Curated annotation (Swiss-Prot):
Residues 210-268 form the CTLH domain. Keywords: Cytoplasm, Metal-binding, Nucleus, Zinc, Zinc-finger. GO terms for molecular function: ubiquitin protein ligase activity; zinc ion binding. A zinc finger (RING-Gid-type) spans 491-557. Residues 124-134 have a biased composition (Low complexity). Residues 110-142 are annotated as: Disordered. It comes from Candida albicans (strain SC5314 / ATCC MYA-2876) (Yeast). Belongs to the FYV10 family. This is Protein FYV10. Its main location: cytoplasm. Signal peptide: none annotated. PROSITE patterns: ZF_RING_GID.
């Protein structure tokens, strides 16, 4: 059964319920803490009022008024938490109703009977087999009616949500410069805002606020090298992160320490290391976190791994401090003497250890912090680290990918306009499956650069301003994009948009064929081998003559080929 069924959609949409569920749990714990804190504060304030027997009534009145104000502030905070809880629960209800809507698009028994009556002309054995399969599907799982226009609209909404999810997470823009209005800086939120004008229920089907916060923290780390947002997120979720033996706190302190060294604050970096990094060299500090967890075995492995990894990274910091202090001293001496750099300094700066320690100040530390943040974020909310749209695309591309992909000579999308091919089909590992917009854009741009100057001139691919039309989003569709490239592509696997994603996917499991023992002729046509060998009455003598010469004739083109040149194409 290859058609998506009702149970299939229920299973694939389970992750939509995880984030609201975790947010409800987190919000409930905050309510408990708030109530407990207010209870203790209220008891203390009342006891103080009772003990103040000698004080004037006016002073007692001030204490009571202060108590009332504190309680009113508590009620406002509590109401905010209650509103959040209602919002999270409404998201769960909306997503449940969204899945329940599929029940309306299920194929009914009447539809099955009509389909069975329509297939009465087939063989009896096949009829019995189909009837058994239909009854099993109706009892255990239910097929969806893809001819229902409402179901198509439902799929369109789900596709829009996948695109919004991808754009929110991968957004790198912080502000729109088109106008002065307060438009959302996240391009995914802008798309969601436009979609909700016609379908307001989409707001309940995606956790846009949480994903936006995730994107802000990620962009602040990778692009801005700012630790303020990640520190705030860590403090907000510190208790939950300790339960999963998170290494995020070390990554934050590690980046902060290297930032101080990079600025030249050696003394401040040493003091910061003593207060915030020295404890990670002692394994006992990790054991304290492990004892508070239930899963002792798995958490113990994680603790041991974190300790060994952090210890190795801490060992390199001492050497970095020595070399950076020597470098600063040499700079100070050179400024005082205003002479050329001494030979010892040149040897030190060009030495291999110094270059190795200098690598610690590269962007790798920010990438490591960002990766640790992604792992902790996805683990807290029980979601996948991959984009959901990539998962769906991978499933669809795997069903289309064959061994002829990247080898079709008629597909010129990856060839120069001069006819020189490009080797993308020899297990090239240069294209990694990274979830990054810049990489995806790099694939498209690399294909755009294949256009020669002559082709660009002939096809008028540049505007009056000198900007290439190929960079214009409106020309990225199938009607303009490949035409401007002057190339042909009829395969989604080989397209530049999906080539990178589909490269490492498995081939489709082609275990059936409409032909019996199909063979491919040199001209590309495929026929059952029995049809090529079995002569008809009209061409009986001609085929017999060809077979004696070990040759066959194409029934359509009338071309003659040797049998040895035919290739068996099944199984793939």
């Amino acid at each position: 059964m290859t058609e998506p069924t009702l149970n299939f959609h229920i299973q694939t949409h389970q992750n939509q319920f995880k984030i609201p569920h975790e947010l409800i749990k987190k919000n409930f714990k905050l309510i408990q803490k708030l109530i407990e804190k207010q209870r203790k504060q209220l008891i203390d304030d009342i006891s103080k009022i009772k003990k103040c027997k000698t004080t004037s009534p006016s002073f007692k009145l001030e204490l009571i008024q202060k108590l009332i104000k504190n309680f009113e502030s508590f009620m406002k905070k509590l109401q905010n938490f209650i509103n959040k809880d209602e919002e999270f629960r409404s998201r769960l209800i909306a997503r449940l109703e969204n899945l329940t809507e599929l029940q309306q698009y299920v194929i009914t028994n009447n539809d099955n009977q009509e389909g069975q009556n329509h297939e009465e002309s087939t063989e009896n054995n096949n009829n019995n087999r189909n009837n058994n399969n239909n009854s099993t599907t109706t009892d255990d799982d239910k097929l969806l009616d893809f001819h229902n226009p409402n179901l198509i609209n439902w799929y369109r909404d789900q596709t829009n949500l996948l695109i919004v999810d991808y754009l929110i997470k991968s957004n790198t823009r912080t502000r729109f410069e088109d106008n002065g209005e307060d438009n959302p800086g996240n391009i995914g939120l802008l798309l969601l805002k436009n979609l909700t004008k016609t379908n307001p229920k989409l707001l309940k089907l995606i956790d846009y606020d949480l994903l936006e916060n995730f994107n802000k923290v990620f962009v602040s780390i990778i692009n801005n090298h700012d630790l303020s947002l990640i520190v705030g997120w860590f403090n907000e979720n510190k208790n939950l992160l300790n339960k999963i033996n998170s290494n995020l706190e070390f990554e934050i302190n590690y980046c902060k320490f290297l930032t101080l060294i990079e600025k030249g604050d050696i003394n401040e970096a040493i003091n910061y290391s003593r207060e915030n990094l020295s404890g990670y060299g002692n394994k006992e500090n990790y054991q304290q976190t492990n004892n508070n967890n239930n899963n002792t075995f798995s958490n113990g492995d994680t603790t041991s791994t974190n300790h060994l990894t952090n210890l190795e990274r801490l060992k390199g910091l001492g050497g970095l401090l020595v070399f950076r202090s020597m470098e600063n001293n040499n700079k100070n001496n050179n400024d005082l003497n205003s002479n050329d750099t001494p030979l010892s300094s040149k040897l030190m700066l060009n030495s291999t250890p110094f270059k190795e320690y200098q690598k610690l100040l590269s962007n790798e530390r920010w990438e490591s912090l960002a990766q640790c943040f992604i792992e902790n974020f996805t683990k807290l909310y029980g979601i996948s680290k991959n984009f959901p749209i990539y998962i769906y695309l991978s499933a669809g591309l795997s069903s289309l990918k064959t061994k002829s992909c990247y080898h079709n000579v008629e597909n010129t999308i990856f060839k120069h306009s001069t006819g020189n091919g490009i080797d993308y089909d020899n297990g090239n590992d240069d294209y990694d499956d990274d979830d990054d917009d810049d990489d995806e854009g790099g694939v498209i741009d690399s294909n755009l650069s294949f256009i020669s100057a002559e082709t660009t001139t002939n096809t008028n691919t540049t505007s009056n301003s000198g900007k290439s039309l190929l960079n214009d989003p409106k020309y990225r569709g199938p009607n303009h994009y490949y035409k401007l490239l002057n190339k042909i592509n009829n395969c989604p696997i080989c397209s530049p948009e999906l080539f990178k994603l589909s490269q490492n996917l498995p081939y489709a499991q082609l275990i059936t064929s409409i032909f019996n023992n199909p063979f491919k002729l040199p001209n590309g046509n495929i026929y059952p081998f029995d049809k090529l060998l079995a002569p008809t009455d009209k061409y009986l003598s001609e085929k017999n003559t060809l077979l004696r010469a070990n040759k066959v004739k194409d029934p359509l083109t009338r071309e003659i080929f040797t049998i040895d040149s035919c290739i068996r194409v099944f199984p793939a």
